[in-house]
């Protein structure tokens, strides 16, 4: 018979000699296995027995995977250790060492990294399969062991592989060139399977992602790469083999100014990482989320996410990638006016190897801004031009990674050298081409500071449009602040008062206290009282298109300029303005600004 109560059953089991109980657990595990039971109950009995019979290896690995996916990391690690200890073959034990490292990695990469020396040796000895070697190389790169990583990658490219394995190797090599741009002085060899099938054949999503990332690194962001990233993300959940690929897909979106899509996916992935009990994955994603928030001008959020990234993982476990949260945190604190905290984080030691990585470029960029904010323009210029020198040497001179020319131009302006600033700003604009972007908007803003006063408003209006279109609220606030100064210099005091108020409000939405303190003396609250209740009601009868035309007209744009910005004909603009004048009972553009300035500012 069966004892009905679990306490009674446990009491009986507790009376059995240990060797008898072990034997019972082993017999139960074998019976379950022979009956085709699920791996988890079998693993439960084997863990209780503390033994892994010859037949149990695959079952234990599958059970561990299920436990890890469900967030039971400690239990999953215990099952993997049992499988490893019971393995008899050299290749099997090596593969289980990789699985153990991956499981430990989700908690603490620095601790998991103690296995890498033996795994690199196993890879060199031919004891690891292709997938295990790819994983080992990724981990070696992350912790800054570049010589060993290159050795593993070189060995992989010499192997005969399946198309799927070749795709993973190809992504690894592209990822290595992205994270360590100076690592490969020559183009690494293609895997043999890739050479056989031809470069144009994309055998799986990771191969397509590698191609997209490679294209972005060579030519900058493009719509095809964005589509690839957007198609990749829904197909892969967060797991041991996906963090690098997911990071690559998010990087493509971020570099392409698709911050809303990147935000959506990062938030979803953060939920997955929490469910899987993976603090290192959470840390990585918080770091990315902080960068996204910073690019959108959400300074308080950027700081919060960067602090969460550092809280979820120690500095040794961040290794060379610590440049991601640190650079975000420094930039956010500068914008928030918290120089003390920015200084404290700059004083934190960082690994020398970080400056060989793309994350080191972000750190230099942030440190340069710190020097600018503290009046050390020469030091800032040195950091920005060092970025430029490294990017040129590494053949990744892409403003989407770091727009060093714009910020070097800012340093030259601080040094009272406007001619050099203009040369760099114009060079940046030439490199960027016609497509709008955050960096192009920043370059236009710097260029405006180097031209005669009468030419500044047009450049700054273009900059505000681009910042707005890219979702960069902080950039928009700075451009509006510059526009208000340009308007005041030309004697256009009414527009200047309204523009500076708008800059102040946008800066407030970003929590940009440093900028708000600068703007506060020029803010005229009386300018907000010009729109009475009836005027407000009339303004809200306008269609969205009419409001947009009214805002641009009030800012001083010509009908042709409005048509170009809104992608409509001049005739359409004229028709909209006629309706605007009639609905608002005004006869000229100046009346729009005087009577409805604050309302128009809300659109701008």
Residue spans of the language-model regions?
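Short, charged/polar, Gly/Pro-enriched secondary-structure boundary elements
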Residues: 9-12, 51-57, 148, 177-180, ...
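Internal alpha-solenoid helical repeat scaffolds
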Residues: 39, 71-324, 332, 440
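Short secondary-structure boundary elements
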Residues: 1-78, 82-85, 583
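Short helix-coil-helix linker/hinge
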Residues: 36-40, 473, 541-545
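Helix-coil-helix junctions within alpha-helical repeat/solenoid scaffolds
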Residues: 5, 74, 79, 84, ...
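Residue-level marker of regulatory loop/turn positions in helix-turn-helix DNA-binding domains and
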Residues: 21, 52, 401, 541-542
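Alpha-solenoid repeat junctions
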Residues: 36, 50-53, 104, 108, ...
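Helix-turn-helix DNA-binding segment
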Residues: 482, 529-604
């Amino acid at each position: 018979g069966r004892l009905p109560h679990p306490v009674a059953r446990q009491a009986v089991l507790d009376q059995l000699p240990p060797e008898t109980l072990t034997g019972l657990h082993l017999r139960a595990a074998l019976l379950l296995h022979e009956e085709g039971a699920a791996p988890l109950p079998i693993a439960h009995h084997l863990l209780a027995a503390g033994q892994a019979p010859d037949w149990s290896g695959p079952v234990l690995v599958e059970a561990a995977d299920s436990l890890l996916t469900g967030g039971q990391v400690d239990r999953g690690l215990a099952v993997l250790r049992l499988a490893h200890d019971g393995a008899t073959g050299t290749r099997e034990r090596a593969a289980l060492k990789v699985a153990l490292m991956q499981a430990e990695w989700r908690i603490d990469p620095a601790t998991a990294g103690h296995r890498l020396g033996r795994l690199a040796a196993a890879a060199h000895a031919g004891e690891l399969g292709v997938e295990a070697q790819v994983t080992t190389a990724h981990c070696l790169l992350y912790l800054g062991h570049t010589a060993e990583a290159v050795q593993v990658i070189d060995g992989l490219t010499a192997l005969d592989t399946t198309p799927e394995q070749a795709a993973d190797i190809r992504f690894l090599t592209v990822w290595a060139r992205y994270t360590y741009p100076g690592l490969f002085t020559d183009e690494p060899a293609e895997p043999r399977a890739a050479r056989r099938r031809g470069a144009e054949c994309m055998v799986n999503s990771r191969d397509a992602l590698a191609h997209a990332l490679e294209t972005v690194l060579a030519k900058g962001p493009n719509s095809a790469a964005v589509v690839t990233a957007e198609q990749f993300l829904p197909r892969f959940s967060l797991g041991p083999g996906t963090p690098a690929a997911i990071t690559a897909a998010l990087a493509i979106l971020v570099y392409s100014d698709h911050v809303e899509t990147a935000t959506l996916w990062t938030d979803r992935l953060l939920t997955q990482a929490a469910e899987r009990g993976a603090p290192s994955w959470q840390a990585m994603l918080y770091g990315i989320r902080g960068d996204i928030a910073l690019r959108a001008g959400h300074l308080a959020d950027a700081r919060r996410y960067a602090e969460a990234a550092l809280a979820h993982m120690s500095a040794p476990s961040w290794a060379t990638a610590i440049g991601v949260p640190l650079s975000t945190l420094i930039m956010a604190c500068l914008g928030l006016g918290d120089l003390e905290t920015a200084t404290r984080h700059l004083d934190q030691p960082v690994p020398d190897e970080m400056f060989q990585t793309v994350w080191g470029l972000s750190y230099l960029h942030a440190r340069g801004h710190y020097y600018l904010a503290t009046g050390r323009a020469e030091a800032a210029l040195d950091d920005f031009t060092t970025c430029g020198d490294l990017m040129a040497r590494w053949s990744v001179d892409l403003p989407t990674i770091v727009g060093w020319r714009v910020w070097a131009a800012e340093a030259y302006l601080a040094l009272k050298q406007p001619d050099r600033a203009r040369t760099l700003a114009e060079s940046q604009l030439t490199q960027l081409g016609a497509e709008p972007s955050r960096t192009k908007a920043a370059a236009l803003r710097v260029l405006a500071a180097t031209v005669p006063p009468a030419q500044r408003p047009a450049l700054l209006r273009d900059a505000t449009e681009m910042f707005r279109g890219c979702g960069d609220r902080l950039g928009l606030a700075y451009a509006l602040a510059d526009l208000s100064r340009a308007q005041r210099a030309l004697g256009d005091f009414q527009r200047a008062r309204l523009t500076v108020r708008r800059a102040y409000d946008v800066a407030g939405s970003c929590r940009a206290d440093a900028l708000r303190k600068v703007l506060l003396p020029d803010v005229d609250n009386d300018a907000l009282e010009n729109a009475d209740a009836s005027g407000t009601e009339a303004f809200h009868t306008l269609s969205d298109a009419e409001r947009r035309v009214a805002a641009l007209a009030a800012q001083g744009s010509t009908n042709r300029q409005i048509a170009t910005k809104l992608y409509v004909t001049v005739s359409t603009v004229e028709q909209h303005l006629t309706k605007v004048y009639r609905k608002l009972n005004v006869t000229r553009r100046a009346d729009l600004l005087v009577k409805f300035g604050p309302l128009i500012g809300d659109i701008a």
